[in-house]
Amino acid sequence: LANANKLENFPFFSPDGKQLYFCTCDRIDSLPQQFSNIKYRICSIGFDPQNNQFSKQVDTLIDLTNAGKSVTLPSISPDGQFIACSAAPHGCFSSWIPESDLYLYNTKTKKLIAATEWNSPEAESCTTWSSNSRWVIFSSRREDGIYNRLYIAHIDSVGNLSKPFLLPQRDPTYNQRNLKAYN
């Protein structure tokens, strides 16, 4: 499965265990000089859990390289219907890149949409799903461009998105005192 000519990371299985998803890009040997050329895609490969074998076919699901973007930090909803991910101009540490935005891939329709209701002029990244697949928590620097804060937003079963709101903290200064990033 590994390819010496590629950089591969962020692997995760589908909830049913029959697909392995991962990020991949062409290997760049002159880092950090060519860091801006790193553009990841999200791929999948079938997996047979009964026989513990991968299929031979790797499919590219999300590829924004022609749009000049790198897609990373994917997470799948527990019902397996949506993959949330971050897209940024390069690399894989999107929480540090202001242009980083969230996207959603519908595994049933094979459509990718920008999560415009969730995005801001600052970085959004690092998604996680509720157990019922209807809520997403993600990090955003929208408040000040410096500190990540956690936002929560609703998504319905067909992919309609609600406006996110700041995840309440007992102490409103918690994020500024403790962390610059959730990753």
Per-region residue spans from a language model:
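Sequence signature of WD/YWTD-type beta-propeller architectures
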Residues: 1-183
